[in-house]
Amino acid sequence: MFQIIFNELSAAEMSALPKRMQLNLLEQFQILPEDLDHLDAKHFGVIEREGKKLYRYRAKDYRIYFAQTPEGITIHRVLHKNTFRDFLFRSKLPVAEDQQLGKTREFWKLIEQGEKTRKA
């Protein structure tokens, strides 16, 4: 059975949003594993490092970072785009370059914080 799993950190980030925004984001994030083979560049990005693949989904002003797992999809982070832009600015990276982002330790530390938390 396909599941969308939030870890503790991404669940906390999602629950901090107003209920209406939560529902809007979840409504937009309609995805199946086979969708990952044919990504829409308008909404999706792929970030890779050392054989690890992470996906980014753009939903309004938020970015959902997730990975494909045998169970389905695990959501690692749900971040407001301005927060993420601040991170990119501090890292001196161009905003649109997922490949450059995948090479920065700071980004992967941010994701690993979510991975280390328990599933919600």
Predicted regions located by residue number:
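A generic structural signal for beta-strand entry/edge sites
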Residues: 1, 52-54, 70-72
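Arg/Lys-rich, positively charged N-terminal/basic patches that mediate binding to nucleic acids
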Residues: 1-28, 101-120
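Short, functionally important structural connectors and interaction interfaces within domains
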Residues: 9, 31, 36-39, 71, ...
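Short, intrinsically disordered, mixed-charge
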Residues: 19, 30-34, 80
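Short, cationic motifs built from Arg/Lys/His that form the positively charged side of catalytic pockets
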Residues: 24, 55-58, 63
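A short, surface-exposed loop/turn module that caps and links secondary-structure elements
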Residues: 31-58, 110
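Enriched for short, Lys/Arg-rich terminal
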Residues: 62-63, 67-120
